[in-house]
Structures are given as C-alpha cells and as structure tokens.
Swiss-Prot record:
The gene is pdxJ. The active site is at H43 (proton acceptor), E70 (proton acceptor), H191 (proton donor). It catalyses: 3-amino-2-oxopropyl phosphate + 1-deoxy-D-xylulose 5-phosphate = pyridoxine 5'-phosphate + phosphate + 2 H2O + H(+). One of its GO terms (biological process) is pyridoxine biosynthetic process. Keywords: Cytoplasm, Pyridoxine biosynthesis, Transferase. It holds the Pfam family PdxJ. InterPro entries: Aldolase_TIM (IPR013785), PyrdxlP_synth_PdxJ (IPR004569), Pyridoxine-5'_phos_synth (IPR036130). Its EC number is 2.6.99.2. This is Pyridoxine 5'-phosphate synthase. GO terms for cellular component: cytosol. The record marks E151 as: Transition state stabilizer. 3-amino-2-oxopropyl phosphate binds at N7, R18, G192, G213, H214.
Length: 245
C-alpha cells in the first residue's frame, strides 16, 4: 500500500538560518505523524547545513512510524547509522556546493564500495535503499550490491517543461519500477514532487512510499503543517489522515 514519508529537512533549514532552537524538527515530526505521515525522512549531510546529529538521535527516540535516514556512503555516516540504527537508510550522492541532491547515485560506478556499505548496514539490521535515477543500468546495479529498495529520483519528471516531456519521464519511472520489482527490489520515489504533480507518480504500480519535503513545508508556512500533510495525502489519493479534522 502506498505511503507518505515526510521529509522535515527544511524545518531545520529555517532553524539554522538564525542558529537558534526553533522551529524544532522533532516537534514537526510529531505533528506530521499525527496528521497521517507514514514515515519521517531526514538527510544528515556531511556539512550539517540543516539536520544535526542531535536531531537524528532525538528522532530515533520519538518517531513512532519509521525513520528514514538519508546519507552519503562515507565511513563517518555509516558509523553514525550503525550507532543510531534508523529503521532504514537511503544512500544518496552528495556534493557540498549543491543546494539540494541533484541526481541519483552512480551505483554502477562504485559497485565494490556500495556492496561493502550495504553489507555493513544490513548486517546490523538496517535495511538499505539507494536513491537512483530511473536508469536500467543503475537499477540492475542496485540489485547487484544487495539493496532492499530503490528510491527513484523524480527530479526530471518534476522539472519537465512540457506535458510531452513529463509523460516521457513518467514512462521511464514506470519502466524503472517494473524492472526493480522484477529484480526483487522494493520501490520508493521522491524529489521535486508537489501537490500538483504527485498524482501520476502515486499511481505507478508497485510504488510503496513517496518521500516529500519542500512542497509540504512550503505549504505549511501558509496553512500549518497538519493541514499541509493531510492535503498531500489527499493529492496522493490516500485518506486525509488519522487525527481530528
């Protein structure tokens, strides 16, 4: 069944803009869960530009759905994950100069390293997802290194400048999902998804979870986080949530 993972990185972005203590990502996670989020996603970047290690530790103690830790495949991040033990890890590419993650992980180009990292994490009971472009070579490599999931990068779909281009990108996502499932992988997706473009991705056969952050947090500034999460669930074709209206 399709689920919604709410990425709360940009709650921390707002906090870090003033180097203060609020808004608190941990409090945001509680509100998101009460509004119907099926999981909480955070990206602990090497430069600590938004989410801090302390946030991840507190979230591990407080999240009642599941905690998805996005991170680079570095020794430092692997050590943190092995200590904190999130419900699962999503390995993502990372460059210090980027504003946000700009593309999928090159799994095919680093099979040996990623096999080692996946083995370390999953050997300690932490399932691993790989954030990849909807590319047959990368999906095959994800299966080769032993990952449990792929998270399909929906950026090109989200940024398509015409209806024809968007439909072509959507077709690639559908094909990638089908290939992943045939290889025994589970399928999530995310990046650039909004209230206006999420519907077709939500309807891709086999899709398990959509991880969405910026659009929800942007909407929350105007209408509040609880309503923003409920509205995203509705846009995905899910029930509006579990708490009071």
């Amino acid at each position: 069944m399709l689920s919604l993972g709410v990425n709360i990185d940009h709650v921390a972005t707002l906090r870090q803009a003033r180097r203060t203590v609020e808004p608190d990502p941990v409090a945001a996670a509680v509100i998101a869960e009460l509004a119907g989020a099926d999981g909480i996603t955070v990206h602990l970047r090497e430069d600590r530009r938004h989410i801090q290690e302390r946030d991840v530790r507190l979230l591990r103690q407080t999240v009642r759905t599941h905690l998805n830790l996005e991170m680079a495949a570095t020794d430092e991040m692997v050590a943190i994950a092995l200590e904190i033990k999130p419900d699962y890890v999503t390995l993502v590419p990372e460059r210090r100069e980027e504003v946000t993650t700009e593309g999928g992980l090159d799994v095919a180009g680093q099979v040996s390293r990623l096999s080692e990292v996946v083995s370390q994490l999953q050997g300690s009971g932490i399932p691993v997802s790989l954030f990849v472009d909807p590319d047959p070579i990368q999906i095959a490599a994800a299966a080769q290194v032993g990952a449990r999931w792929v998270e399909l990068h929906t950026g090109r779909y989200a940024e398509a400048s015409s209806e024809a281009q968007q439909e072509a990108e959507l077709a690639q996502l559908r094909q990638a999902s089908q290939q992943a499932i045939q290889l025994g992988l589970r399928v999530n997706a995310g990046h650039g998804l909004t209230y206006w473009n999420v519907g077709p991705v939500a309807r891709i056969p086999g899709m398990e979870e959509l991880n969405i952050g910026h659009s929800i947090i942007s909407r929350a500034v105007l209408v509040g986080l609880e309503r923003a999460v409920r509205e995203m669930r509705q846009a995905m074709g899910l029930s509006s949530g579990v708490g009071p209206a």
